[in-house]
Amino acid sequence: AFVPGGSSVPVLPANLIYKTANGDDRLMSYESLSDGGFATGSMLGSGGFIVYDDRACIVRNTWNFARFYHHESCGQCTPCREGTGWLEKVLWRIENGQGRDEDIDLLWSIQSKIEGNTICPLGDAASWPVAAAIRHFRDEFEYHVRFPEKVKNRNHFVNEPFSKVLTSNV
């Protein structure tokens, strides 16, 4: 997976890093990265790139982003003040083996109520990573909910990458 611009931009799965959803070559340009909107694209942000291999836990990384945005929220507008807190709480629950089946859809609902409804762009920046993580890596969220005993180990994908875990537990 690849985050082409810091924590506030949507993460792309491996299949969308080099090619767009239409099969065109993806360049590291604003236009190419935005191809397909946030459903299949992303954007350049701060100039910082984050690259994940299959041992990285997308849920944990999304939770870390949510913690950051919750901490940074000034609290002036309700969607950001309350929404970022809820994103952090629900992601913590999933990452720590206490997730429920409905939590993934709850995250989707929360992020959709934050995006476009805040005074400043921090709310959008908080919602986009969550939306992209669920859109592209829902199977990893479902794994966390289905196998809580396995994800309680902080290094759950270091020793056994998720790509291998997924095929062995299907």
Sequence positions of predicted segments:
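Redox cofactor-anchoring modules in respiratory/redox and cofactor-processing assemblies
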Residues: A1-V170
